[in-house]
Amino acid sequence: VPTAWAAWNKGFPGFFAFNYKLFDKKRRTRFMKMLSLEKELRENAYPGRGIVIGRTPDGKKAVTAYFIMGRSENSRNRVFVEEGEGIRTQAFDPSKLTDPSLIIYAPVRVLGNKTIVTNGDQTDTIYEGMDHQLTFEQSLRSREFEPDAPNYTPRISGILHVENGKFNYAMSILKSNNGCPDSCNRYTFAYENAAAGEGHFIHTYMCDGNPLPSFEGEPKLVEIMDDMDAFTEMLWNSLNEDNKVSLFVRYIDIETGKYESKIVNKNK
């Protein structure tokens, strides 16, 4: 392999060509690979709870999806129901509800032109914080991962901001320090001027396990569909049949702010 000095000895053109190869290699490797969301879900029996946010290929709609899964009877005994402009989890059979903490909450709330999506009651924390002029990230500083040892389930959150024909979004994960509850690791990912056809996917667990391993890395780059019905069907059919519980999908018109939503519940 030629060194930079050897390339320079061959003359400036050789030096430039050598360095361009290095630059081009770095340029090619720095881009995140777009993943198949369908494949990601089909190959993971238990991602836990998941949030998808993105923009349709035609650039006209902001998209979010939220799903919940469960392994225990208590966790599986849930449905999504509409509440105002958002949704709430509810016990399907109240007589079987053993512990409402951590499983009964509002995953989706709307504050003006902002749509908040989370896997816990931090939805309310974000709503109240932003209503008092705090940022998304600042609002979450008072929260940390869930106290469900030994899993210490991460709190995942997302926010969509649609205003004046523009769309930005952000995602957050609060998780234990590699399973140690003494420290909380906080990560926020912001996406300005969201690109058409692209979205990001974050979920609570890397895979099934005991204890359940927390999500690692930044949100995954995934494709988004123009057709809400097709997107909803793909998501629901890709989730593990035994573990899936409920799915929520919303498409928001970026120009008008009007939205359409779909809810799919396994319990009927």
Question: What residues fall within each predicted segment?
Answer:
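Tryptophan (W) side chains
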Residues: 5-8
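Short, Lys/Arg-enriched N-terminal segments with co-localized hydrophobic residues
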Residues: 11-31
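Conserved short alpha-helical segments that host acidic/polar catalytic motifs at enzyme active sites
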Residues: 28-268
